[in-house]
Amino acid sequence: TGAKPKGISEIKNSPLTKAEGKRMIDELWKNSSPATFQPNENGKIYAGISSKDILQKLDIPSDLDYTDKETFLIDYIHYQKGETDFYFLRNTSPEWISRDIGFRLQNSVPEIWNPVSGEIAPVTVFEQKGKYIRLPLALPPYGSQLIAFRKGSASEQYTSAQKSGQHPPKMEFTSEGIHFLEDEDVILQKQQEETTVSNSLKSHEITGEWEVSFSDGWGAPSNETFPELISWTESENEGIRYFSGTGTYEKSFDFDLTDTENKKIYLDLGDVQKVAEVWLNGERLGISWAKPHRFDVTEIVQPGKNNLLVEVANVWSNRIKGDAVTGENFTNTNIRNTIIPSKGILADDQTRYPWKDVPLIESGLLGPVKISVVKLK
């Protein structure tokens, strides 16, 4: 594709002359225009027309299709190995999204591959519609999914999942079934049959005081009571406000454990800045560094009293700024200035600022922390 070159540059020690190059260009681009192409042994050349328009003229639809694809809300990569197609999808927004997504494939069965847990889960809601395999997919804020399509067919899957509103319900495909994550009825369709899933989402927010201890040697007190969850940077205590390191949150809470048949129970930490390691009733749940900060506690949470422990580590820059502002010397660094991070993916401003002028970065467990019971289908 592209406009016809005016000529070629002279290449040292090459038998190709400028005149010969000009003749070849004229031959390749002969009769090319937005409406025509010139066949040649290497393919077809289009001039004066965009790649998108060329694909449309050739009746080649988008590789990935969804209602508002012009917004580029979902970034993706398509890779093929043997007879298996892999799609890696990424949510570019800070909010949950759910879309009915079409993948330009035929005669394939989708699976969700989880690179964190190693789990491979079948997608039990999908349909072949024309040139696309369509399925409902939910992505967490800035989250991603790896979907593999293996050659084959499936006859027992649902063909669609619907709720009120423009987009499909927020749900997840797991090896145990579908997890419905919204408090709303969902209609599952299979050929001429409809199944209504009444999903009354039970959620218990863990509120009240938290006991927080901080790692020694970085300016914060050993222990502090937080009446509510806030960023360390909002604390009136200067040592906490400029703290960099690990803070350990401890709290007991009561939970009413009833009617758990065909349900899963999750602990959701809400917002965490930046990395958390979690224990419930002495059982290690794991580490979370990206939303959703959520753990399956179905087999661990117990009726009555439960004990929760969350270790949160933040970034180094807050303590460096604190030293620059207060004149203290908890850090040992010769870096006197830095670039202020931008919220944009591509930041043009490379200006370096003194540490005292650098804004603090939110830190700690921000919540809300919830125990949620979700329906399993």
Short names for language-model regions:
Residues G102, F253-N281, L308-V312:
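Aromatic-lined ligand-binding clefts that engage carbohydrates, nucleic acids, or primary amines
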